């Protein structure tokens, strides 16, 4: 029984996992749905019209503190999850980066996945319910291969390496990429990987050592 248990406890072999091209995948989100930064001459009136309680008050406090930090030449670091990118807010974040208001961005590994896919094909967010049924969930090969390539760059953080790669590879929709814009503007974009929580970690091409090292560089 102990021998069987030891055998059963061996790590699974990922080499036989089947991947497919992301170009064949149905996506739930595309760049046509993205938000766009626009100028509002009287936007202050809208902000002032909001209730003086709870979320609206919190929003005003965030705005005030960002403005104060910017005016005092302090750092404004945006820490985001993947939904900021998935839900079409990248262009607004990029606009704030270009204006010198956001001075650094920290994102999780899923954020990097969405950012890369949007830069490559102009869409992201697979149909999870469908792909779980047929076993294809997370198996788009281009995303995993690109992030692994970036992670393997010596002494470079994953965020910068992936941003550089998006620019070097001339991804068709790179103007929607926070990672690429960070590399172009030389603004720190850090990616904080959590092994096992992101779809690409199932791919045979992925090196846990490279993921850990490149993300640790970003952490530092």
Region locations from a protein language model:
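Metallocofactor- and cofactor-centric catalytic cores in central/energy metabolism, strongly enriched
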Residues: 1-220
